[in-house]
Regions:
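Gly/Ser/Thr-rich loops at beta-strand to alpha-helix junctions
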Residues: 78-82, 203-214, 266-274, 311-313, ...
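Active-site phosphate/pyrophosphate-binding segments
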Residues: 276, 283-479, 484, 504, ...
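Anionic-ligand anchoring segments at beta-strand to alpha-helix junctions in alpha/beta enzyme folds, i.e.
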Residues: 197-257, 279, 401, 405-441
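Short, Lys/Arg-enriched N-terminal segments with co-localized hydrophobic residues
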Residues: 31-43
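Acidic, Ser/Thr-rich peripheral helices and adjacent loops at domain boundaries
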Residues: 478-513
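Extended, charge-enriched "interface" segments that sit outside catalytic cores
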Residues: 49-195, 558, 594-598
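N-terminal small/polar loop signature for handling phosphorylated ligands or for N-terminal nucleophile
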Residues: 170-192, 197, 242-257, 264, ...
Length: 615
């Protein structure tokens, strides 16, 4: 009786879907013609929570949670359903990306509701606004154009952006040409250090998007045949944390005579970055003084370069303005890996040629995202599923599980891309959201994660997961006498884990297997844990660019659906302000033994304890 009643609830949601499709748009939801122009010029649409699809999806989600017949073990037994929940993207040369989301807790009808909701909130128009350079980052009055960084020379961007398209793309390629020329001089030995030694060590100083994205790409290419060959004899390291331990570990075995420091800061005022830059400057000057070089100005000019927009502060630091590589206000930090922020240090390590292939891969997905129909669009599908899991199924976390050790820093980068973008409390026009946006992202490469946090995923909280695997290994190994290659062993787990999460193992299964009664409940796997599987051909520079762009655009899609601004980050400001107050107190107390003033009792007590400590 209960199941029948629950089924009626579910089918009422599907009935509502049919009613929505049959009814005129102006009778159920604000028509497209009612969309208005935001004061900054971006197109706004109705909020997702104001659409009838939102209500229908809430109803469907409640039923999905309650109805045993909608358990994934039953949904996945429907071959037709599973075949309909797969998307394929193929590029020249036979490269494939297969996205299988049949193990998500969705049906064809639920996906139709999601597509219809996307239509009502103007997803396509918002996507086009981004493509054409409208100022969709309205709180900062900026366009969002990281996709332009990947456009090849000769691309006719003026078709999309008649007013500024050609100028913007010309500027992008002027910087890229400058990077290529400088990198060629360093890698060929034409640009040497002050002692005449070639510069083979690269210390990249930056934090947040200036570090996480480039570091992900560095690690992803480390075992690639072409990239590793190009990197022979060179090493790139990232210095982000202001903790002096990070600086010590980064530089302790480097020769300053062979080291080039890359300082990355848009404003050249980022507190942590500039303190590390000054520390590196002193390290270079002191280290080279020990080798008989005393011209500090010449040391800085030959051993320090900058990625910044603040030429006056860069030159004041002592850096040759010809060794400054710019970018633009329309490049957000977490989306900047394809700008000089990432391309300068990564080209020094792997060559400009390899990084051009990376940019080509990202551009390939940009074109797919902007052109492909929504139902075949990989970032759109991932974004809609993310909205379903977060907003309707109320799952607050997402695991990123790349079955490739090369992607060990990928989850950390996407953690910033997604959480800094979509962790917002109000819509783009300042209205509090009626639900929580964003997800808590975390992950580790498989199979390492299986021996760490998968226990919770299988028998604890429900955590939607993205499995990412590759048909080819960067370093194939096949040992004589083993039944499978090392890569096949890895991929065996890639294919098995989503099924284990979806199907689980029941009490009756355990009884049939003869498991002792006292252990049966401990060994039950409830299953019904959602995941998507993305299988790509190979992880080279092009493939890494594809993967990056898929997840960047996935994040934007979710923000578009939620009607939030995914491209600002006001949430990072308050802590900076408070840290400035603490910094001032520490300075005063260290110099004059002044007592702690102006803080709450808890912080005051901790500060007093910190200041009173004697080594």
């Amino acid at each position: 009786m209960k199941l029948r009643r629950e089924a009626l609830v579910f089918f009422s949601a599907i009935s509502l879907l049919k009613d929505i499709k049959a009814s005129s748009s102006d009778s159920l939801v604000t028509d497209y013609s009612s969309r208005y122009q935001h004061s900054k010029g971006t197109t706004m649409s109705v909020k997702c929570s104001d659409t009838p699809q939102f209500l229908a999806l809430q109803t469907a989600a409640e039923q999905m949670k309650m109805d045993e017949k909608l358990h994934l073990k039953h949904l996945c037994s429907d071959a037709a359903r599973c075949a309909g929940l797969v998307a394929n993207h193929e590029t020249e040369g036979g490269r494939k990306i297969i996205l299988d989301y049949s193990r998500q807790q969705v049906t064809g009808e639920i996906m139709e509701l999601l597509f219809d909701m996307a239509d009502k909130v103007g997803l396509v128009d918002k996507r086009n606004d981004m493509r054409c350079g409208k100022k969709i980052n309205s709180t900062e009055g900026r366009a969002v154009l990281h996709h332009v960084l990947r456009m090849p020379k000769g691309y006719d961007y003026s078709v999309r952006n008649p007013a500024e398209g050609k100028k913007i793309l010309d500027e992008v390629h002027a910087v890229r040409d400058k990077i290529e020329a400088f990198v060629s001089k360093v890698r060929s030995g034409e640009h040497k250090g002050v002692t005449g030694k070639e510069l083979k060590n690269f210390v990249c100083i930056g934090i947040g998007g200036s570090q996480l994205g480039p570091e992900f790409v560095l690690e992803a290419l480390r075992a690639d045949a072409k990239a590793s060959q190009a990197a022979m004899g060179r090493q790139l390291r990232f210095l982000a944390n202001v903790d002096p331990v990070d600086f010590n570990v980064c530089t302790r075995d480097l020769d300053p005579a062979e080291t080039l420091v890359v300082v990355i800061s848009k404003t050249f005022t980022t507190a942590e970055t500039m303190l590390n830059a000054r520390t590196a400057k002193k390290w270079l000057i002191d280290g080279l003084a020990d080798q008989g070089i005393v011209d500090a100005d010449d040391i800085v000019k030959k051993h320090v370069i900058a990625v910044s927009t603040a030429e006056d502060l860069v030159t004041e630091f002592g850096i040759d303005k010809n060794n400054m590589f710019g970018f633009w206000e329309w490049v957000g930090g977490r989306f900047s890996v394809c700008s000089a922020v990432g391309i300068v240090p990564l080209s020094l390590q792997y060559s400009y040629e390899v990084m051009s292939e990376f940019l080509d891969g990202a551009h390939c997905i940009d074109e797919h995202f902007f052109e492909a129909p929504l139902r075949e669009n990989l970032p759109v599908l991932l974004g809609l599923i993310g909205v379903w899991n977060s907003t309707f199924m109320c799952y607050g976390t997402r695991a990123l599980l790349p079955y490739s050790q090369a992607l060990k820093r990928f989850p950390a980068h996407i953690q910033q891309v997604d959480m800094e973008s979509n962790g917002k409390r109000v819509t783009i026009d300042g209205v509090p959201l009626p639900f929580q946006s964003g997800e808590v992202d975390f992950g580790e490469p498989g199979t390492n994660g299986q021996h760490s946090f998968y226990q919770l995923m299988h028998q604890g909280r429900v955590v939607p997961a993205d499995f990412i695997g590759f048909m080819e290994s960067q370093t194939p190994v096949e040992l004589q006498g083993e039944i499978v290659s090392n890569h096949d062993e890895l991929m065996s787990n890639f294919f098995a884990q989503p099924d284990a999460l979806a199907y689980g193992k029941s009490l009756s299964d355990l009884i049939q297997e003869g498991v002792p009664e006292n252990l049966r409940e401990h060994k039950v796997f409830m299953g019904n844990r959602p995941s998507s599987s993305m299988l790509m051909t190979k992880l080279d520079a092009f493939g890494i660019g594809q993967l990056l762009a898929i997840y960047e655009h996935r994040t934007a899609v979710q923000g578009f659906i939620w009607s939030i601004n995914s491209f600002d980050q006001w949430g990072v400001e308050l802590g900076k302000v408070l840290a400035k107050q603490v910094r001032s107190q520490l300075n005063t107390s260290r110099k004059s033994q002044a007592s702690v003033q102006g803080f709450n009792s808890s912080t005051s007590a901790l500060l007093e304890a910190y200041l009173s400590h004697k080594k």
